[in-house]
Amino acid sequence: MASKVYYMNDRATHGGESVPFKAVKLLRDAGLKDMVKPGATVGIKIHTGNYGNSATLRPQWVRAIVEEVQRMGANPVIVETNLNINAMGGDRQDTKQHRKIINRHGFNEQTMGCPIWLCEGPFEFDDVKCEVPHGVYLNHTFTPRRMTKLDTIIVVSHFKGHLQGTYGGAIKNIGIGMASNRGKSATHFLNHPEFGLHSGVVNQEVAQQMMQAPHPNFIDGIINNCAFDCFAVEDGEFVFHREKCKDCSACYYPTLFSGLMQFSNTLMTTTPTCIADSCAGIMNKLGKEKFIFVNYAYDITPSCDCDNKHDAAVIPNIGTFVSKDPVAVDMACLEACEAASVNPGSAFDAPGLAEPNSDRFTHGSSLAQVSQWCQINSGVFNGIGESEYELVESEPLSEAEVSSWIQDYDFTNPIGKRYRDQIRAFHFDTEGPTAVSEPRLPLEDQIKRPAGLVKNSKISDEQ
């Protein structure tokens, strides 16, 4: 049976159609009220992105959802997890740094009007096991224990491309976004018994080049970064003691992308499918009936919000999608992105990508060219949703209702009445005419196009 996906496009002709309030109406249409009881704890799962990336979820969008939950008499809480320990540095790998980043992006208790849980602890070691009974690859994953305290979960996602997941949406925001550190490693196959990190092989040629750099150099960083002392320089060679490796993943990205170590291609090619497996495990553990999904298809970039930068949007803004089915809501976004025109000059404005229905994220986002349909098909296989959907175009909220949220006065108590004494005491005398009757610059000179560009140059030319 086809799942319902509720949708509103990117246009706005009055306040009720503004982006923050689209999700409010769509959540109502999708039946959020039936999922929320007064006094319940409602988790709002977000991903704020890394510092430097501004094509991410807006605080205003999330705040509107927070206020809708509060109007229902429930207790909203923003929930997020720390980044996996898979690099020497990073914005969100420990709670202190993560909170610093979300503050920079406008997410804190004051701006959101509710608590923010960065689940759980500095490195999310307090987690629970989530069985994946029908996983394509995974047998189980892990989610922070604090997630089990939630009565309802609104998963709010920015839809975009992804280097490893091929695309990021609702499924990934659970499969990775609600996984603990161990869960994230499992999803990336980093602790796989055959293909995991301990199977990595040192590229000695690259290592020798790196060791020639002045100290402290990259090799020093890799050695110091391993909490289990797996790396060393012995007899002039860079050595990986795999028998010491505990698959913590701290070395993965720096050694992979630098070419210092070679890992099985399976680590990359299985990621989208494992994301869906992990999503299924976490949803089954917490209760599938607790979930509802909001996908914002705006600022659709070729790469993920995990990056500390963002490229130009590859597709024009499409709109807001809401469903109780994570597979269907992602499928609706994928098909809308496949049907849309691409933005001129963007990464997708290229042969093989610009044409509709060309599997754009497969060929334009995924590092390993993994199909964008893997998450969808694996989600169906895991029983968390359906790829077939009915797209229901919703009607906006009334401008009157939205206005009542924006301002705390109305026609019965207008601002002139409320602040009568203060207004009457204000000094309105302009101390003479503020303008002349005839313009000093004739109208024909005001409207003509002025001289513009004289020369194109680069900063290197000046240097």
What is each residue range found by the language model?
Residues 2-46, 51-61, 67-68, 72-79, ...:
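Extended, low-polarity segments enriched in aliphatic/aromatic residues
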